[in-house]
């Protein structure tokens, strides 16, 4: 009887442990620092906002193996491949969120977009127009507000070279 009670206690402990781990895995966001949580919430809001506007989202948080950083959202709008840099805030500051996309960030996004383009069939690459947009997401108590800057910065050359 005592060994049966020990087994029952062990089973209950394992079930609690498994439940705790599964819950933490399902809601990893609770473990994130506030600024990363805001970023993920902003990217999620941007995803649904852009889908509602008719964009076809083909990648989220896309990473290249040899280029630092990621592409927040990649979408098709007609025949244009749009790379979205999402900037999320919980308050509106004097400086817009989009102001953080400086020349270094633009260079990084161009390199990542070039790496992403290599995934497309080679025959189609020259005809793909790439556009870099910035989407600022303000996560306010009254709901999310969006500021979209289409074609925020140009490609370096006209042949899909960044």
Which residues does each PLM region occupy?
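A short acidic/basic microdomain associated with nuclease active sites
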Residues: 52-66
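Hydrophobic residues on conserved beta-strands that form the core of alpha/beta folds
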Residues: 57-59, 83, 132
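Domain-level recognition of nuclease-like catalytic cores that cleave nucleotide substrates
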Residues: 3-13, 120-162
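Interdomain/boundary linker segments immediately adjacent to catalytic/signaling cores
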Residues: 1-42
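Catalytic cores of nucleic-acid endonucleases
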Residues: 88-142
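Conserved catalytic cores of phosphodiester-cleaving nucleases, focusing on short active-site segments
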Residues: 46, 50, 71-94, 109
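A generic alpha-helix signature
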Residues: 37, 41-45, 104, 108
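Short acidic/glycine-enriched loop/turn segments that link adjacent beta-strands
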Residues: 66-68, 142
